[in-house]
Each structure stands twice: as structure tokens, then as C-alpha cells.
Amino acid sequence: MPELPEVETSLRGVEPYLHGKIIKQIVVRTQKLRWAVSDELQHMQGAKIVALSRRAKYLILHTTQGDILIHLGMSGSLGILQENQQPAGKHDHVDLITQDGMVLRYNDPRKFGCWLWTKNAEQHELITRLGPEPLSESFTAAYLFARSRNKTVAVKNFIMNNDIVVGVGNIYACESLFMAGLHPELAAQNLTEKQCERLVKVIKEVLAKAIIQGGTTLKDFIQPDGKPGYFAQVLQVYGRKGEACNDCGTIIEAKVIGQRNSYFCPHCQILPR
């Protein structure tokens, strides 16, 4: 699943081709994604793309005729190509075509993403309920400690909750907890202030590093330039069940926590009894 670094990578990849451009047409081949594609998108001819931004895992195109919210879902990706360069494939559901012949193509085999129109993205219900950005100054140890009080949920589920902090998906949650030395099943309310300081620090480090390296190379993620990301080459625990921990040599274990596979080192991440 594309996570925050993948969406940030997509934003940086497509922005040079779309910023300041005039929309010629938006071609919708599949109306039903996670939510129905907004009808308004097919009436945006002449709209100028004045800015592009990201909030959590939503890519936002700000235009003179409202904002377009794009979510990549479980397997979505964005590509840039020239108009008529390549016929649309089976899973190419939406094309945004600019007047100068550039195409933003949305591919999604599982059809679990979205393309929505809204007058103002900041006021859309999908955006207003989100927690702080993990790389922002709002995401601090003091904030995380305060939000964790009386929370009996496992710390892994806690940091993956978008109401608490956005964009810490399964891969990066596993990696961050390993680097912080915290067992994924530790109750959030048992976090100490010092542990929160460490956890916030490594979450920021892991995500920043992944963005620099282009996101995580998984079968469903391709960068807008067609190249894979490279962060998977340095994953410490995620997807490494049965392999030796790079720090201590103990065998990495996996367990389903909150309906997600969670990877951890039982020696480096001890669950207090």
C-alpha cells in the first residue's frame, strides 16, 4: 500500500509537469473506485492548476475551479506521459490531460483509491478529522504522550491511527517501533515520556529517509518517473520474518496485530510483563 513517503514522492514527481497548467480534459474510465468519482471532474475544462500539496496520504490539486482529492488506495500509482503516447490499460481508470498535452494517469488494479472534487480541500470531511503531519512541528513527544494517556490499544495501532498522527502506515510503524526498541503490543498508555521522545524522533527519521530514497519498493508501488523506490533495500524488520535481526542476530518474528502483519525482534523489542 502506498504510504506517506510514496505519496510525497508522487507529489514531487508530478508537480513539475502540472503546476500552472490548464486542464484540457479529465477522462474517467471507471466511475466506481472506493467512492464514486466526482461528476464535477468531467467539467473542469479550462481550470488552472495553481498548486499541488499533500495532506496525510491525499494528493491535492488546487485549481481555479476547486480542489481535486486523490488517494492511491491499496495499489494505486500515478504516471506522467504525453497525450497519445500510450493507450490506456485495463487498470488505467483516470487521465487528467493538460492543454499542452501532458497526461496524469491513475492506475489502480484494486480500485480502492479515490478522485474527488471539493470546493476547498481543507474543509473536506476526509481532511478535517486528520491528526498532525508526522514531519511537522505539531507532532511532538509532549503531544504523543498526552494523547497516549488512558489508551489501552497496542502502541502500533496507536501510531497508525490517523486521528493521532497521519501517514504512519504498517511498514513504517514496524520500522519505527524497532528503532525505538518498543514491542508493537505495548499498551500506548504505558509509554513513558522518554519513550515518546524516542518514538517521535525515529518516526520522523524513518519517514524523512524514506522520502529521500523514493518510498518503499513493493510490488504495487512505482514512482511517477517509472522507477521503483529504494527504501525496501534497508528495511530492518518489515517483511523479514525468519531472518536474523541486523542488530542482535535473533530471528525476526511476525504476528497479526490489529489485522495487520507486524514484524519485530523479540530480543530488541521486549514486551514488559
Swiss-Prot record:
FPG-type ZnF: 236-270
Free-text comment on the cofactor: Binds 1 zinc ion per subunit.
InterPro entries linked: DNA_glyclase/AP_lyase_DNA-bd, DNA_glyclase_Znf_dom_DNA_BS, Formamido-pyr_DNA_Glyclase, FPG_cat, MutM-like_N-ter, Ribosomal_uS13-like_H2TH, Znf_DNA_glyclase/AP_lyase, Znf_FPG/IleRS
Organism expressing this protein natively: Actinobacillus pleuropneumoniae serotype 7 (strain AP76)
Subunit structure: Monomer.
UniProt protein name: Formamidopyrimidine-DNA glycosylase
Cofactor(s) listed in the protein's UniProt record: Zn(2+)
Catalytic reaction list: Hydrolysis of DNA containing ring-opened 7-methylguanine residues, releasing 2,6-diamino-4-hydroxy-5-(N-methyl)formamidopyrimidine; 2'-deoxyribonucleotide-(2'-deoxyribose 5'-phosphate)-2'-deoxyribonucleotide-DNA = a 3'-end 2'-deoxyribonucleotide-(2,3-dehydro-2,3-deoxyribose 5'-phosphate)-DNA + a 5'-end 5'-phospho-2'-deoxyribonucleoside-DNA + H(+)
UniProtKB keywords: DNA damage, DNA repair, DNA-binding, Glycosidase, Hydrolase, Lyase, Metal-binding, Multifunctional enzyme, Zinc, Zinc-finger
E.C. number: 3.2.2.23, 4.2.99.18
Protein family (similarity comment): Belongs to the FPG family.
GO biological process, alphabetically ordered: base-excision repair
One Pfam family hit: Fapy_DNA_glyco
Cited SMART domains: Fapy_DNA_glyco, H2TH
